[in-house]
């Protein structure tokens, strides 16, 4: 399946289609959007965002704890869309606070 991903960035929102077997960060880059990242392995917080609508599968990541995920935080480098989804990007500072 392919879902609509909307990223709300500091420069404004961007939308693109993302297959459910492609990481959101990877697809965003394919579409020409630059997002923050570092490890690309779900082991840090550089790419953190916050899901405001929809669901993702980020089971490949290991940095976020259950509480953070329950609060909506997502690591875009290891997140597959599970529905149409809206994610606020550039949330590392809010996450690590």
Swiss-Prot record:
<dbReference type="InterPro" id="IPR012675">
    <property type="entry name" value="Beta-grasp_dom_sf"/>
</dbReference>
<dbReference type="GO" id="GO:0009570">
    <property type="term" value="C:chloroplast stroma"/>
</dbReference>
<feature type="binding site">
    <location>
        <position position="44"/>
    </location>
    <ligand>
        <name>[2Fe-2S] cluster</name>
    </ligand>
</feature>
<dbReference type="InterPro" id="IPR010241">
    <property type="entry name" value="Fd_pln"/>
</dbReference>
<dbReference type="InterPro" id="IPR001041">
    <property type="entry name" value="2Fe-2S_ferredoxin-type"/>
</dbReference>
<comment type="function">
    <text>Ferredoxins are iron-sulfur proteins that transfer electrons in a wide variety of metabolic reactions.</text>
</comment>
<keyword id="KW-0001">2Fe-2S</keyword>
<dbReference type="GO" id="GO:0009507">
    <property type="term" value="C:chloroplast"/>
</dbReference>
<feature type="binding site">
    <location>
        <position position="39"/>
    </location>
    <ligand>
        <name>[2Fe-2S] cluster</name>
    </ligand>
</feature>
<protein>
    <recommendedName>
        <fullName>Ferredoxin</fullName>
    </recommendedName>
</protein>
<dbReference type="GO" id="GO:0022900">
    <property type="term" value="P:electron transport chain"/>
</dbReference>
<feature type="binding site">
    <location>
        <position position="47"/>
    </location>
    <ligand>
        <name>[2Fe-2S] cluster</name>
    </ligand>
</feature>
<keyword id="KW-0150">Chloroplast</keyword>
<feature type="domain" description="2Fe-2S ferredoxin-type">
    <location>
        <begin position="3"/>
        <end position="93"/>
    </location>
</feature>
<dbReference type="InterPro" id="IPR036010">
    <property type="entry name" value="2Fe-2S_ferredoxin-like_sf"/>
</dbReference>
<keyword id="KW-0408">Iron</keyword>
<dbReference type="GO" id="GO:0008198">
    <property type="term" value="F:ferrous iron binding"/>
</dbReference>
<keyword id="KW-0479">Metal-binding</keyword>
<dbReference type="GO" id="GO:0009055">
    <property type="term" value="F:electron transfer activity"/>
</dbReference>
<feature type="binding site">
    <location>
        <position position="77"/>
    </location>
    <ligand>
        <name>[2Fe-2S] cluster</name>
    </ligand>
</feature>
<keyword id="KW-0249">Electron transport</keyword>
<dbReference type="Pfam" id="PF00111">
    <property type="entry name" value="Fer2"/>
</dbReference>
<dbReference type="GO" id="GO:0006124">
    <property type="term" value="P:ferredoxin metabolic process"/>
</dbReference>
<dbReference type="InterPro" id="IPR006058">
    <property type="entry name" value="2Fe2S_fd_BS"/>
</dbReference>
<dbReference type="GO" id="GO:0051537">
    <property type="term" value="F:2 iron, 2 sulfur cluster binding"/>
</dbReference>
<keyword id="KW-0813">Transport</keyword>
<comment type="similarity">
    <text>Belongs to the 2Fe2S plant-type ferredoxin family.</text>
</comment>
<keyword id="KW-0411">Iron-sulfur</keyword>
<keyword id="KW-0934">Plastid</keyword>
């Amino acid at each position: 399946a392919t879902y609509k991903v909307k990223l709300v960035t500091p420069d404004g929102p961007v939308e693109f289609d993302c297959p459910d077997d492609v990481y959101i960060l990877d697809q965003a880059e394919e579409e020409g959007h630059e997002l923050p990242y570092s490890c690309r392995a779900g082991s840090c917080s550089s790419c953190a965002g916050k899901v405001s609508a929809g669901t993702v599968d980020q089971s490949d990541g290991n940095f976020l704890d259950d509480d953070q995920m329950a609060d909506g935080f997502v690591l875009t480098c290891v997140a597959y869309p599970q529905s149409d989804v809206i994610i606020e990007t550039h949330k590392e500072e809010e996450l690590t606070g």
